[in-house]
A protein has these predicted regions:
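Glycine/Thr-rich beta-alpha phosphate-binding loop at enzyme active sites
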Residues: 23-38, 245-345, 380-398
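A short, basic/flexible loop-to-alpha-helix module at the beginning of a structural domain
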Residues: 39-47, 436, 521-539, 645-660, ...
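N-terminal capping/small domains of soluble enzymes
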Residues: 1-234
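Catalytic cores of alpha/beta
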Residues: 65-68, 355-371
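Beta1-alpha1 glycine-rich phosphate/pyrophosphate-binding loop at the start
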Residues: 456-466, 503, 507-511, 537, ...
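Glycine-rich phosphate-binding active-site loops on the catalytic face of alpha/beta enzymes
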Residues: 76-86, 245, 362-389
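Ferredoxin-type iron-sulfur electron-transfer modules and their immediate structural context
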Residues: 320, 326, 331, 377-378, ...
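Rossmann-like dinucleotide/flavin-binding elements
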Residues: 542-563, 604-613, 627, 631-635, ...
Length: 983
């Protein structure tokens, strides 16, 4: 597959725009185009933009369709992608070149087109916007600004190629592309109501009146000044000079990023030493401002360029990449503050560097505009994020630029150091991709449900809860989840981590809504709960913890006879007996147990069960061993207290605890967090410290539990391993992190140094294991580590939950119970529920909305199980198209528009890369042969050259040899997008 893009000819581009708008009301995938209805305008370079923002020079301003899509979203200031003397195939760009999962990184730079192609693209976009702005009622024909960008040295900028580019954008009227666009427009006046040939002739060919200068790292200040002076005096262009965050100095940048959690972002001081220095910059900018004023022009700064960092983990190809997005915001906003203070607020700034929905209006209110964006548009929603921003900006008071409000700017700069949006989480994000290949057809997937071990129908119950139908919501939950009250309280909710909303604002309150439904819908649901039949199975369940309770629920609901043997006096296992009350109330456990009683489950309490063989001999048809992980982990340090034993005592007999003032917990899982928080609540305790041989980022504890412990005052000592405990002192060895182990975490290595901590009680929270002796007594086959070899031990004996996995989560125990129940019964115990309403689902994609009341949170759910389209939205070039087939969105990749940036691969929930793995349309046979993608190209005889599963053949689009869904998608693509065959 080639990474060379094929610009769309103007007639085909306009055909797509007009057809899509008439059919769907959308423009190049922007589903609800922004209409500037207020009529308000700003003044910039003698032009009158309707809004003060738009896409930055980069992936969203390279092709005509990118600029048009941005305009449709409400952008009215377009910073065109930089051109330089190296272009086209002479400019190699490593691929993939973009990684925007959290903060952004890239290894691209100037346009990948040739300079003449770039000129054509910008002229096409300018002309197209002149046509559609008024025709579609989006705004005034002169309501937008194009700002060209050039680099990187004066000699290159003075070459004939770049000079022709600059002059062509200053006056495009004599360019072949302008003339071709004008001819097309005059031949299609009927497509634009009221448009006349005279009006077309009156379109201003002055595409750009301003320019942004980009220079390479290490460019001497004298060269920067020479280029800027040339652009001002010789080219008579309003000029912005792009500055680097390195102006802040290495120490400030390093300390700031460290304080915000980016200590592992690697860079040294060489760029800081070689780049423009602040002491040289300010006098230069004073001189250039004076020169601009003498020419009747504006001089300002573009803040800022991306930030160069080292590639250390193979994130992208090469040795150095450029950081953007939320991590760049604190640096760039402080650079803006520093420079504006030096100029007493009089310096004009074009801002980029982490701008997004959350800070855009504050920048504008401070007098910092125009503002350009990149990283936020690379995330789900893409260009559809723009209308919300445009509306917010248009609601502000428009005033002429008279200077920057330094107090507002300083407040923004200070806020950037404390706002959690710009801080990296304590722990790395969980993987958001599954381990499956994306299918060619029907790939929409809800990552929340996919990440859930029991695949809860989350959007369905969220919708029902939002409608106040809590009993129905609980019914949907209980079809797959036997413990709604327990999981609604303490589930580790991987669904929340997987929620696509994480890429917008805040994840949905999935667990909270589950608990809400379990509490408000419980009594009516319980009243109606009954076995669905009468089955012959008699199942003995050994252990009444979460696994045993869940298995009993699924079996009894289906009509099986179930008996639970529980050693203690109540069901719940570790959840009831160990997990502190401040995490889950006992009445939540009681409600889940009450459902078992309603289903007729027999519960034998305070009883140790017979062996599996004996139970089978006594008439049970099946035995399930749900006896937990009873073998407690040890540090093997004399005087240690086991965390489980401590938590049991703290929960059942808190008055008997005498643990002293200084408590140390060794370990870093959720049990360690529970033990530390419980110890803090014991009278007489002065402080609690967790020691861990790695760092917080490697801790196995959920980040939520870690943050709760920190908030309550638990101290953390990283890189310490306990070695001895005596005389109220704990001696620990200092550790350092080495290479990653098989789990991906960096292995701790000894340093030979020790440290001593005050310690009255040492609590060991170092994991539990299944009880190998008990399991062996029940005939369970064990591996070399003493763990069961399989969940299904025989046709009649099963092991599940912690007894199978070791310490695991409640929802994993439920997943084991589901699978076991279905094997015992020979039927599925689950139903599939899909949210019935798709109203506004598409409109929500792009809208940022912070979490509110949990029961109203469905308004933020995007229904990813029905409509995903992440790959469509995040592609700057519109290379992934949504084709609706039988009421479902399918995705077709358009080869000629793709430059293999890799952004769609980042946000696809599958392990795949849509630009490589989805069904692909090729413009001709040469492009088809240059790729291994599944897909097709149309031949002049009306047949298609097809590739599927590695096989190539000629076929009619209705060829029965084609899979029916693929054939239908190919036909529908050509019907909905006939311009593809013409381009």
């Amino acid at each position: 597959m080639s990474d060379r893009m094929r610009p769309i000819p103007f007639p085909e581009l306009m055909e797509q725009i007009l057809t899509e708008y008439r059919r769907d009301g959308s423009v190049l995938g922007v589903r609800a185009p922004y209409r500037h209805e207020s009529g308000k305008r700003l003044e910039l370079f003698g032009e009158k933009p309707e809004t003060p923002f738009g896409p930055a020079a980069g992936p969203h301003t390279q092709l005509a369709q990118n600029l048009i899509a941005a305009y449709a979203g409400g952008a009215r200031f377009m910073e065109l992608k930089t051109v330089q003397k190296l272009d086209g195939e002479d400019l190699p760009v490593s691929k993939p070149c973009i990684l925007a999962e959290a903060e952004g990184y890239n290894v691209e730079w100037s346009t990948e087109l040739t300079v003449p192609q770039a000129l054509d693209e910008y002229v096409k976009a300018w002309f197209a916007l002149k046509l559609i702005s008024a025709a579609f009622g989006l705004g005034a024909r002169d309501g937008f600004v194009f700002n060209m960008s050039v680099g990187y040295d004066l000699a290159g900028i003075r070459t004939e190629k770049l000079d022709r580019f600059i002059e062509g954008l200053k006056d495009a009227s004599q360019t072949p592309m302008w003339q071709a666009c004008a001819a097309w427009a005059k031949a299609h006046l009927s497509d634009f109501e009221g448009l006349t040939a005279a009006e077309v002739d009156a379109f201003s060919p002055q595409v750009c009146r301003s320019i942004t200068l980009s220079t390479l790292h290490g460019c001497p200040p004298e060269e920067i000044e020479r280029i800027a002076a040339y652009l001002l005096k010789d080219k008579h262009l309003h000029t912005f000079v792009k500055c680097n965050p390195t102006l802040l100095g290495y120490t400030y940048a390093r300390e700031t990023l460290n304080s915000l959690g980016y200590a592992d972002v690697a860079f040294d001081d060489h760029h800081f030493k070689n780049d423009l220095q602040f002491a040289d910059a300010v006098p230069m900018f004073v001189r250039l401002s004076s020169l601009a004023q003498s020419q009747g022009l504006t001089f300002g700064l573009k803040l800022s360029n991306t930030f160069p960092v080292k590639i250390t983990r193979g994130e992208l190809p090469g040795e150095e990449m450029y950081m953007s997005g939320k991590a760049l915001w604190p640096l760039t906003i402080h650079l803006a503050e520093t420079l504006e203070k030096a100029f007493e607020g009089e310096l004009r700034v074009s801002y980029s560097g982490g701008a997004d929905t959350h800070n855009l209006t504050e920048l504008f209110q401070a007098g910092i505009w125009p503002v350009t964006l990149a990283t936020t548009l690379l995330k789900p929603g893409g260009y559809n994020r723009l209308p919300q921003m445009a509306r917010a900006l248009a609601a502000q008071e428009y005033r002429p630029f008279t200077g920057v409000a330094l107090d507002r700017l300083s407040a923004l700069a200070q806020k950037s150091l404390t706002d959690p949006r710009y801080r990296r989480p304590l722990k790395p994000a969980l993987p958001r991709k599954n381990d499956r290949d994306v299918p060619l057809i029907d790939c929409s997937l809800a990552p929340c449900s996919d990440a859930c071990p029991i695949h809860q129908d989350i959007s369905a119950y969220m919708e029902l809860a939002a409608q106040g139908r809590y009993t129905e919501a609980l019914g949907v939950i209980c079809d797959k989840n036997a413990l709604p009250n327990i999981t609604g309280s303490i589930c580790n909710h991987r669904c929340t981590a997987a929620c696509v909303r994480n890429q917008y604002d805040d994840p949905l309150s999935i667990r909270q809504v589950k608990l809400l439904a379990a509490e408000r819908g419980f009594r009516p649901y319980l009243d109606a709960l009954a076995p669905v039949g009468d089955r012959p199975e008699r199942v003995a369940i050994v252990g009444g913890g979460p696994a045993g309770m869940a298995l009993a629920f699924f079996l009894a609901r289906a009509g099986a006879k179930v008996t639970i043997f529980e050693e203690k006096n109540a069901l719940g296992g570790v959840v009831r007996n160990v997990i502190p009350e401040f995490r889950i109330a006992c009445d939540a456990i009681d409600r889940d147990a009450e459902m078992l009683a309603k289903l007729g489950v027999q519960i034998v309490r305070n009883t140790r069960a017979e062996t599996a063989q004996t139970l089978l001999e006594n008439g049970f048809t099946h035995v399930a061993l749900c006896c937990g992980a009873q073998s407690r982990g040890k540090l093997n340090i004399p005087g240690e207290t086991n965390a489980i034993a401590f938590l049991e005592q703290a929960k059942r007999y808190p008055d008997t605890l005498e643990i002293g003032a200084h408590i140390v917990v060794a370990g870093a899982g959720n049990t360690a967090m529970d033990a530390a928080r419980a110890a803090l609540r014991v009278p007489g305790v002065a402080d609690v410290t967790i020691v861990y041989r790695r760092t917080k980022r490697e801790m196995p504890a959920e980040e939520e539990e870690l943050n709760l412990a920190l908030a309550e005052g638990v101290r953390f000592e990283e890189l310490l391993a306990p070695v001895s405990f005596a005389d109220a002192k704990l001696t620990c060895e200092k550790m350092k992190l080495g290479a990653p182990d098989e789990s991906g975490r960096r292995s701790p290595e000894t340093t030979g140094e020790t440290v001593t901590l005050p310690c009255d009680t040492l609590i060991a929270a170092v994991g539990e294991k299944p009880d190998a002796v008990t399991l062996a007594e029940n005939g369970v086959k064990l591996d070399a580590k003493g763990r069961p070899t399989a969940r299904k031990q025989s046709e009649r004996v099963y092991v599940l939950g912690d007894a199978l996995r070791g310490p695991a989560t409640v929802v994993e125990a439920i997943a084991d119970a589901q699978a076991t129940a279905e094997e015992i019964l020979g039927i599925s115990t689950r139903k599939c529920h899909c949210a019935t309403s798709d109203t506004e689902l598409l409109a929500r994609r792009g809208i940022e909305a912070e979490a509110g009341a949990p029961d109203a949170d469905f308004a933020r759910c995007m229904g990813c199980d029905k409509v995903c389209l992440n790959c469509v939205d995040v592609c700057p070039n519109r290379a992934n198209e949504a084709v609706w087939l039988n009421g479902k969105p399918q995705v077709v990749h358009i080869d000629g528009r793709c430059n293999e940036c890799g952004n769609c691969a980042t946000f696809c929930p599958y392990q795949s890369a849509p630009y490589l793995d989805k069904l692909t349309f090729f413009v001709d046979e040469a492009a088809f042969r240059d790729s291994g993608n599944p897909g097709w190209t149309m031949r002049k005889d009306g047949n298609a050259l097809v590739r599927l599963d590695g096989r190539e053949w000629l076929a009619a689009l209705n060829d029965p040899a084609l899979p029916a869904e693929v054939s239908a998608l190919m036909r529908e693509t050509m019907r909905q997008m006939p311009w593809l065959a013409k381009a």
